[in-house]
Design a protein with these regions (language model features):
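Bacterial N-terminal signal peptides that target proteins for export
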Residues: 1-8
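C-terminal motif of bacterial Sec signal peptides marking the signal peptidase cleavage site
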Residues: 16-18
């Protein structure tokens, strides 16, 4: 009787263990299927957004330029003229004729201006138009290359708060830097260098730092929607509040 009981108990233990193992496999399989089913949708969204950002930067960055404002100074004991950098900023190619748009405060007071393209070629530039009341300036580079790349124009009147934006520029002299964010607000007012009020300005949380001035603000289609021009920051560095002049205003100048 004892042997029979012992055999019966062993059989029951083995049977229950097998059942438990099967249930565990089924449960784990179900969880794995759930994770696998959920993962592609999330990863696909992230990948699409990243791919969009990467593609925009790849296409737009060749149109972004480095603008250097220089002063000329004659040496005390020689007739040689020295070039003293007074400041720098960003600009972008407006058309294939070599017109460059930037901020007025980037080029103000310059005795010589140079524009460096993405291929590192440096070109002298002349000022052909300014609108201090809008903090805008237009330059023309000498001997523009045939392969100058421009930016497609968007319509800033169609912007909505929350839309994705991208800023490309040269903050602190670090050329071709990309930052991203959203449209934080529309219709802001800021002061131009002429102390006149610029209305209808775009506010964004995309990082804009000294050196970004004059660079393009783009939408998720890679279209130009604004010119980065100012930040609100007690420290002078980005505090998540940047401003851009709408492209529709630029087109009117």
């Amino acid at each position: 009787v004892t042997r029979a009981l012992r055999a019966f108990l062993l059989f029951c233990t083995a049977f229950l263990g097998a059942c438990s193992s099967d249930d565990s496999v089924i449960a784990n399989s179900a969880l794995a299927d759930t994770r696998d089913a959920d993962a592609p949708e999330y990863l696909s969204f992230a990948t699409q957004d990243e791919a969009n950002t990467t593609e925009i930067f790849s296409k737009a960055s060749p149109a972004v330029v480095f603008v250097t404002n220089k002063a000329l100074r004659r040496g005390l004991f020689s007739l040689n003229v020295e070039e003293i950098p007074r400041g720098s900023g960003t600009g972008f190619v407006w058309n294939k004729a070599g017109l460059i748009v930037t901020n007025f405060h980037v080029i103000a007071g310059a005795q010589r201006l140079t524009v460096t393209l993405q291929d590192r070629s440096e070109h002298d530039a002349e000022v052909i138009g300014v609108a201090p009341e809008k903090d805008l300036a237009v330059l023309r580079i000498e001997n523009p290359p045939d392969d100058l790349q421009t930016l497609p124009l968007g319509d800033s009147s169609e912007l909505q708060v929350g839309r994705k934006v991208l800023a490309i520029g040269n903050p602190f002299g670090l050329d071709t830097t990309l930052t991203t964010g959203v449209v934080s607000a529309l219709g802001r007012e800021i002061k131009a260098p002429s102390n006149r009020t610029i209305r209808g300005v775009i506010q964004t949380d995309a990082a804009i730092n000294p050196g970004n001035s004059g660079g393009p603000l783009l939408n998720s289609l890679g279209q130009l929607i604004g010119v980065n021009t100012a930040i609100y920051s007690p420290s002078g560095a980005s505090a998540g509040i940047g401003f851009a002049i709408p492209v529709n205003t630029v087109a009117e100048v």
